[in-house]
Structures are given as C-alpha cells and as structure tokens.
Design a protein with these regions (language model features):
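N-terminal helical capping/dimerization or prosegment-like subdomains
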Residues: 1-93, 317, 334
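Generic non-transmembrane alpha-helical segments
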Residues: 5, 12, 16-19, 23, ...
Length: 452
C-alpha cells in the first residue's frame, strides 16, 4: 500500500522537495539571511499540506524555527521529529556538475545542495507522516521542529527548547540526518561524536612586507601557523594537546567485535574518494577511528598572496579553521579552552596568536534496548530485508545532547544517507531508491511504535 502511494505521488513529492532546495538557505553566509525566512515559511506550508493541524514559524535568537503538530490523543505518546532546513555553502561552484540550488534528477539520483543533508532526509519524515496521517493510521501524537542553524552549531536552539519545553514535550525524538554504511547494509546510528570548532589568527608584521627586505629577519605567520598545526599530532595520528585524552574511554571488546563484523569495503572506501592509502590513529580500524576515537582536522587555511603569478611578500596574517570531533565524556567547552590555551602557550613570541571558539556540542549514545529503537529497527528491517546494524558513526549533531538535557528524552537516529551522497561536498545527492525506502521505513516505524 505504501509503495503504491509513493509511486502515485512521487512526482508531486519531488516538486515539493525541489521547492525547498531552490531556496539557498545557507546559514553560514549572511547574504542568505532572507532565504532562511523564506525556507521556514515554505516548510510551514508543506507541513500543513502534509496534514498537521497546526504549523507556525516561530522566532528565536537567530534564524526562525518551524513548529508543527498533529495531536490525535492528549493521553497518547508523542514523537518529536527534528530536522534542519539550513544547508552548507555550495562553494566551490565550479566543481558541481549541475546547479546546486536547481535540483536535477539523473542516474537515479537527486543532485542538489540539501538533497540529503537535511532537506531530503527531513522531507522523508514529512512524507511518511503525510501517509499515516491521511490514512488515519496514527495512534500517537507527532510534533515537528525544524531549525535553520544546525550547520553552524545550533546556537539558538538550546534557548528555544528551554523556553518552549511544554510545547516540545514528548516521549522520544526521531531524526533523519545520519547515514547507512551501504544501501545493502542497513544501519541505525547509535552514537555521534561531539565537536569543537575554532578559528585561529597568527599575526606577524603590521602589514604585508617585502620578502627580500624582511625574509630571514622576522617570523613568517604562515610558516608559524603551519608548524603549530603540524605539531598538534604525531606521525601515528595521535593528538598531542596535553590532557586531550584524559576522559576518552576505550571501546569495550564487545563494541570492537561489533564494529569488526561490519563488512566495510576498504578498497571501495578509498576508491570512492580517490585516495591511495588511509591514515589515522595507530592501533585502530577505520570504523573505530570514526566511531570511537576523537580526531583533529584543519577545515580551512589561508593567508598571503593567492592570485595569479608571483608576489614576493611575507603576509601580515595567517588564518585557519580547526575542528576536533569528540567522543562521549569529552566536554566540548573543556576541550575548547584546552586547545585555545595550548596554541597561545606554545606560539613563539615573534608572533601574536588569537584563537576564537566558534561552536561546539556534546557526543551522544543511544541505548539499543529502548522500545522506540526496536520500532525503528523493525521498520528498517521490513524495508531493507535484513536487521540493521547498530553503529556509532563519526558525524556530529550537537543539539541531540541538548534535547536530552532539557527534555529528558532519548533520540532515535534513523538516517537514510550514504557516503556516496557527498554531503557538505560538491555534487551532493540522494538516490531515489533511498528516498522511497526511507519514507516506507519511517511509516513502518510509526506503525510499530503504536504496537508498543
């Protein structure tokens, strides 16, 4: 029945999704501030069309929130569905094979910024709700909360949740913003890493200076920054900030056995991103490195002359954006201060260092014995034909731990992305097969949840 419904309504569904994608709701870029409001308003319209009884765009300290609800019985359980309508910047545009904000279907995939993260996945939730609502299959209440700042760390959502605790009161939270290991390896995410993110600025002379007149006589800020970053890890991939690992727990033998049982194709993994060799902390497998271990990365670095031809200068300033993915028990605020203090302490006196903490969030672990998890597990199994693996994956959704702290409920991470979907990258996409299966699996979740 659900397959037939999707087939008969897919053209309309895609038109609705594409109306969201065409709004360039890039939260990181101030120029797109009006687009955030436009996208929120469009989501409100789509939720009403899907069957909620109430939907509104609500103000926050930042970009607007979208709230919707379908209350079938005040004494029944309530599922809160969370998603985000903001997307990552699409740059570099020249690497896209089609316009990032003009969705295109080719080779069985939807190609666009937000096709997966998270417009596509949130839309899966909305269409699954549409089916159960319009067919009078719901026995529990459903609420939606969609934010517009997830890609910049959800700075406004915590205060919004605190202010609207009663409105958002629920028994469990359902999120589609994660990935499966493969379409033939159904997966439910049971853990997320936390994150801490900084921008570092290294200043030398008070202006860009002639590299012949000053080269060898003063410190070059770019050289210094590169050395500071290089010295933060060793050749075995271990992070060298003192105290960084103090609260990191080793994975249990059972957890390591579970990860080892996941059939990850390492050659295919390398081929998909065109690298010849993998690298990471010595003594751990690839899935252990991304699931159970913290990491340190440079997300951007710039300074000096980068135009055509040559310009012989020593730059006044050099910059980098840095991030650490964290594991449960590592506090992002503590790590934020620890890393900031480290760089200021070890920097040579020949330069000035300013480091700003931009955003962060805690990690999260979902207990796999909770009834709602079992409903999700069954919902996925009914569609994909096999029981989904329980796996901790390397990404971060900082607000998940905040939901638990304020609302006191757990979150089920029921994602339908794939690594090949290239989220945060040029040519982001979503297979139509996963779009369809996702809707069907979430419908099954709701039906199974009602049996609890």
């Amino acid at each position: 029945m659900i397959k037939k419904y999707i087939q008969e309504n897919e053209e309309r569904m895609l038109d609705e999704l594409f109306s969201l994608i065409r709004i360039p709701s890039v939260s990181a870029q101030q120029a797109h501030k009006p687009d955030m409001q436009r996208c929120a308003e469009r989501w409100k319209e789509l939720l009403l069309m899907a069957g909620v009884d109430r939907a509104e765009v609500m103000p926050s300290d930042g970009n607007p929130m979208v709230y919707g609800e379908k209350m079938v019985d005040p004494t029944a359980k309530t599922v809160l569905i969370y998603g985000h309508y903001d997307v990552m910047p699409a740059e570099p545009f020249e690497l896209w094979n089609s316009e990032p904000f003009e969705a295109e279907v080719r080779d069985g995939r939807i190609w666009a910024r937000g096709a997966d993260d998270d417009k596509g996945q949130s839309f899966i939730q909305a269409k699954a709700f549409e089916y159960v609502a319009k067919n009078n299959l719901l026995k529990h209440n459903i609420k939606f909360i969609l934010e517009g700042e997830e890609e910049v760390g959800s700075p406004s959502l915590g205060a919004f949740i605190e202010k609207h605790k009663e409105l958002l009161k629920c028994d469990v939270i359902l999120v589609s913003d994660t990935s499966m290991i493969g379409e033939d390896i159904p997966t439910l995410t049971t853990g997320l890493r936390g994150i801490a993110y900084w921008q570092i600025e290294v200043t030398g002379p008070n202006r860009d200076v002639h590299s012949g007149h000053y080269g060898g006589a003063i410190a070059n800020p770019i050289n210094v920054l590169c050395k500071l970053i290089a010295d933060a890890t060793n050749e075995d991939g271990r992070i060298l900030f003192p105290g960084f690992y103090d609260k990191v727990e080793e994975a249990s033998d059972d957890e390591r056995k579970m990860l080892a049982s996941i059939p990850l194709d390492l050659e295919g993994y390398k081929k998909s991103i065109e690298v010849d060799e993998l690298f990471g902390e010595k003594g751990y497998s690839t899935l252990e490195r991304t699931g159970f271990r913290p990491s340190f990365d440079v997300c951007g670095i710039w300074g000096g002359y980068t135009g055509d031809g040559a310009k012989t200068v020593i730059a006044s300033k050099a910059y980098a954006k840095l991030s650490c993915r964290l594991v449960p028990h590592q506090d992002y605020k503590e790590i934020g201060q620890l890393v900031s203090d480290y760089f200021k302490r070890v920097a040579p006196k020949s330069v000035k260092v300013d480091i700003k903490f931009l955003h962060g969030g805690q990690g999260y672990v979902c207990p796999i014995d909770m009834p709602a998890y079992k409903a999700a597990e069954r919902g996925v199994e009914m569609v994909f034909g096999k029981r989904p693996l329980a796996a901790r994956l390397g990404g971060s959704i900082p607000i998940i731990s905040t939901f638990e702290q304020i609302l006191g409920v757990k979150t089920i991470l029921m994602g339908f992305g794939l690594e090949s979907n290239a989220i945060h990258s040029p040519n982001e996409n979503m297979p139509l097969s996963m779009f369809r299966k996702g809707i069907e699996a979430v419908v099954n979740f709701h039906l199974e949840y009602d049996k609890l």
